[in-house]
A protein has these predicted regions:
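Hydrophobic beta-strand anchors of alpha/beta hydrolase catalytic cores
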Residues: 20-21, 52, 98
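Thiol/disulfide oxidoreductase modules built on the thioredoxin-like
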Residues: 67-75, 80-125
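Sec/Tat-exported extracytoplasmic proteins
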Residues: 18, 27, 42-45, 115, ...
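N-terminal "domain-start" segment that seeds a small globular fold
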Residues: 1-11
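Active-site acidic short loop of glycosyltransferases
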Residues: 14-17, 47, 74-75
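Structural microenvironment flanking redox-active thiols in thiol-disulfide oxidoreductases
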Residues: 32-72, 81-88
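Short active-site neighborhood of thiol/selenol oxidoreductases, capturing the structured segment around
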Residues: 9-32
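Hydrophobic pocket-lining residues within nucleotide cofactor-binding pockets
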Residues: 1, 57, 115
């Protein structure tokens, strides 16, 4: 999967881990509010079981995408391509939306509205 930082990562790199796919946009206030929680979750859990991946809702490309990621202080990887076709959960129609993909690569939950790290961990456990 190509990332905004210019690297590419195969999905197999995250084998056995939960994927937290977060759709965000710069103009979305609640999206900006949840970024620190998502940064924290990714920093604490990416190596051990839960990877946060961002998707810019507006489909920005470089260099604009990198500028916005910097302004919003997003620390987790941002995908260049929407993973929705891979998982089939439907393109979000509002923001923010966070999709939980379980370690078996199945859609576990689609969550609408801003999320906290604790809420995402609880949703994964339910």
């Amino acid at each position: 999967m190509p990332l905004a930082d210019g690297t590419a990562v195969p999905l197999s790199q995250w084998e056995g881990r939960w994927l937290v796919i977060n759709y965000w946009a710069e103009w979305c206030g609640p999206c900006r509010d949840e970024i620190p929680e998502l940064n924290e979750l990714h920093a604490e859990r990416a190596a051990t079981g839960m990877v946060v991946l961002g998707v810019n809702y507006d489909g920005l490309v470089q260099p604009k995408l990198g500028e916005v990621i910097g302004r919003m202080d997003i620390k987790f990887p941002t995908l260049l391509k929407d993973p929705e076709p891979t998982y089939g959960y439907g393109r979000p129609e509002q923001l923010p939306v966070t999709v939980l993909i379980n370690p078996a690569r199945e859609v576990h939950r689609v969550l609408i509205g801003p999320q906290t790290a604790s809420a995402l961990l609880a949703a994964a456990a339910s």
